[in-house]
A protein has these predicted regions:
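Periplasmic/extracellular, small/polar-rich flexible segments of pilin-like filament-forming proteins
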Residues: 57-167
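Membrane-proximal N-terminal amphipathic helix
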Residues: 34-64
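Generic N-terminal initiation segments characterized by hydrophobic and/or small/turn-forming residues
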Residues: 5-9, 18, 48, 86, ...
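N-terminal single-pass transmembrane signal-anchor helix
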Residues: 2-33
Length: 167
């Protein structure tokens, strides 16, 4: 009598192969999602930096006055480069980016951008905007630091308007 079906060994081999494929797939998917979160975070940071730089440049082109960022947000281009004025600008910029509905790619519930002077609240996917002193050799002035944190990077991009850091 001929029996049809699979032997126990054949079934174990198939289960082992499926297990190996699943393990490889999970590792690959995990790396893919981490890379996607990092790239989305860096893209948002780059957009924020370009937006700030372009709008500060527009201030110079229009020769001062008020620059409208959106229907609800604007700032005075004629501000002096001191920490108080830059802090106010930072708050306007934060409001603008939050109005756009930006989310943290890492899934954190905290806002994607916030104002702060230290790294205690920095988490993956968040941007911190603060005002920082001009480099040595400049007697006065301040500039904007837009920090970014991912699972691999942690650094600021320093942004300043022409004339902010001067002797």
């Amino acid at each position: 009598m001929i029996q049809k079906g699979f032997t126990l060994i054949e079934l174990l081999v198939v289960v082992a192969i499926i297990g190996i494929l699943a393990a490889v797939g999970v590792v690959a998917y995990s790396g893919y999602t981490a890379s996607a979160k990092r790239n989305a975070t860096l893209a948002q940071h780059e957009k924020a930096v370009k937006f700030i730089q372009n709008n500060l440049g527009l201030c110079d082109v229009q020769g001062g006055g008020t620059l409208k960022l959106s229907s609800t947000r604007s700032f005075n281009c004629d501000m002096a480069a001191n920490k108080g004025n830059i802090k106010n600008l930072n708050n306007i910029l934060i409001g603008h980016f939050l109005d756009l509905g930006w989310k943290n790619p890492y899934g954190e519930t905290d806002p994607v951008i916030y104002a702060g002077t230290n790294s205690s609240q920095d988490r993956d996917g968040r941007m911190r905007i603060d005002e920082t002193e001009c480099p040595g050799g400049y007697s006065n002035g301040a500039r904007i630091a837009l920090w970014i944190k991912t699972h691999k990077e942690y650094y600021p991009v320093l942004i300043e308007k022409d004339g902010w850091c001067k002797n």
